[in-house]
C-alpha cells in the first residue's frame, strides 16, 4: 500500500451521493448563470424523455451569498425557466432553498419575491423531496456511485452527519449491499432517544 485508507470525518453522505446525479450549480456566479444552467438541464431532461411533472427537478450547491446584489434569486426568474415543472434548488451549505411556485405548492412552503425558503423550513422541505416518486430508487443508485467515488479517492470510512436516523439508515443500507465503507453514524440530540432504543 502507499498510504493508509482515508476517513472523511464530517460528511453528509446522502448529499455527497446527490451531487453525482443532480444539477450542480457550484460554478454559477449569478442568479442569471444559475438559471441558464437550469434551463439547459431541463431541456436535456425533456429531450431524454425524463422530465416528469410529478417529480422534482433538483439542483444543488448554489452560492447566492457570493453573488452581486442585483444578481440574487427571484421567484420570477425561476418560474420563467421552470414553468409548471416543480424545481427545488438547495444552497451549497444546505441552509436555504430556491424553489419555483410549482415546487412551493407541492412542498407546502411559502415563498416571497425571492423564491427562497429559509433554513428551518428548508430542512423540513428538503427532506420531503426524498418522499417524491422515484426518489428512493434514485438515491439507491447514487449511493452506490458515491461509494465507488469514495473508494476511488482512497476513502475507506466516513463519519456521516445526515439529519436522519443514521443508525437505522446505515443498518438498512448495509443489508442492501451498500457496505463498502466503514461508517460512524452521527446522532443529533433530538434523535438520541431513537439511537438508544
Regions found by a protein language model. Give the residues of each.
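Divalent metal-binding segments
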Residues: 1-197
Amino acid at each position: 500500500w502507499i498510504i493508509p485508507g482515508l476517513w472523511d470525518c464530517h460528511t453528509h453522505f446522502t448529499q455527497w451521493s446527490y451531487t453525482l446525479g443532480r444539477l450542480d450549480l457550484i460554478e454559477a456566479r449569478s442568479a442569471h448563470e444559475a438559471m441558464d444552467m437550469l434551463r439547459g438541464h431541463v431541456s436535456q431532461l425533456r429531450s431524454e424523455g425524463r422530465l416528469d411533472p410529478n417529480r422534482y427537478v433538483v439542483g444543488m450547491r448554489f452560492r447566492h451569498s457570493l453573488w452581486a446584489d442585483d444578481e440574487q434569486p427571484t421567484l420570477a426568474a425561476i418560474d420563467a425557466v421552470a414553468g409548471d415543472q416543480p424545481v427545488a434548488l438547495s444552497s451549497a451549505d444546505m441552509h436555504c432553498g430556491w424553489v419555483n411556485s410549482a415546487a412551493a405548492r407541492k412542498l407546502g412552503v411559502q415563498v416571497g419575491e425571492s423564491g427562497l425558503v429559509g433554513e428551518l423550513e428548508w430542512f423540513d422541505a428538503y427532506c420531503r423531496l426524498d418522499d417524491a416518486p422515484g426518489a428512493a430508487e434514485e438515491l439507491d443508485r447514487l449511493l452506490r456511485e458515491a461509494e465507488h467515488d469514495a473508494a476511488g479517492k482512497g476513502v475507506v470510512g466516513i463519519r456521516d452527519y445526515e439529519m436522519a436516523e443514521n443508525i437505522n439508515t446505515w443498518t438498512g443500507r448495509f443489508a442492501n449491499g451498500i457496505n463498502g465503507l466503514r461508517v460512524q453514524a452521527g446522532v443529533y440530540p433530538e434523535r438520541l432517544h431513537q439511537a438508544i432504543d
